[in-house]
């Protein structure tokens, strides 16, 4: 052990930060870049898959070519969602990174592999989130859009998604927080994110407890700050509490950005005022 390494716990913490602060900084940068970009790409993937999975089938022409193609596409997308939601990201990372190299001779760099793995994993979860958000909006909204001549995609973009997004936003934030923490599994393919950088720092002086104490605090700070920023955005999206969010799922009313208790209290007060003649 290096003679310059202090013997007390806090002294070692200071020593590690002074000598390896840049390593932690680079690890933080890589972790946040992977989490932010991959969450965004995953949301885009989930958005389009969610829309496709909610395309209604023509029951009168059950075996038409269009219906058969739609069934095949939905089957493939559902398989993708179930497989990537039902397997650990670490296993997916190993399978994709080494599988592409072995089967297709595709050798990806650190960034490409990290973005691909986390994005498709997030996309599987967000697909179900978007599908649930779409279903939560009252079906009368869809029927009304069809009456005025909108197709399914126009209905989703202009009518359903603006309403569903307020319900979906908390889950998007949750996935970002999860990706910040779970990016550490990418160390198995050599991605030098925060966890991987910490292993290098800890191994230099065998200060595993001290190094990972620092990393634990860093992860907490990152997720705490992100959660507060996301909560601020959610509150901004709440907007005016003088209108009702159109949903058919009462559970949605009690979750996420929708302030159910405040809304119910406001409605009760207005009804009481009406009865009182105000």
What are these regions (language model features)?
Residues 1-278:
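Transmembrane alpha-helices and adjacent helix-loop boundaries
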């Amino acid at each position: 052990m290096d003679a310059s390494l202090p013997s007390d716990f806090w002294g070692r913490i200071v020593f590690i930060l002074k000598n390896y602060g840049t390593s932690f900084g680079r690890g933080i940068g890589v972790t946040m870049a992977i989490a932010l970009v991959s969450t965004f790409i995953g949301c885009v993937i989930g958005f389009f898959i969610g829309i496709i999975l909610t395309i209604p089938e023509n029951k009168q022409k059950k075996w038409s070519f269009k219906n058969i193609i739609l069934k095949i596409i939905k089957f493939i997308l559902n398989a993708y969602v179930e497989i990537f939601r039902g397997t650990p990201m670490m296993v997916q990372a190993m399978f994709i990174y080494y599988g592409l190299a072995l089967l297709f001779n595709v050798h990806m760099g650190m960034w490409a592999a990290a973005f691909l793995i986390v994005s498709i994993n997030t996309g599987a979860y967000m697909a179900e989130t978007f599908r649930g958000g779409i279903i939560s909006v009252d079906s009368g909204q869809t029927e009304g859009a069809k009456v005025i001549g909108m197709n399914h995609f126009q209905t989703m973009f202009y009518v359903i998604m603006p309403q569903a997004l307020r319900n979906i936003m908390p889950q998007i934030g949750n996935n970002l927080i999860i990706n910040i923490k779970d990016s550490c599994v990418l160390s198995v393919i050599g991605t030098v994110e925060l966890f991987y950088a910490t292993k290098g720092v800890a191994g230099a002086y065998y200060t595993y407890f001290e190094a990972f104490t620092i990393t634990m605090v860093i992860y907490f700070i990152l997720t705490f700050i992100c959660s507060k920023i996301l909560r601020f955005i959610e509150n901004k999206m709440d907007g005016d509490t003088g209108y009702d969010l159109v949903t058919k799922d009462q559970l949605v009313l009690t979750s996420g950005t929708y302030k159910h208790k405040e809304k119910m209290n406001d409605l009760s007060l207005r009804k009481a005022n009406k009865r009182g003649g105000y």
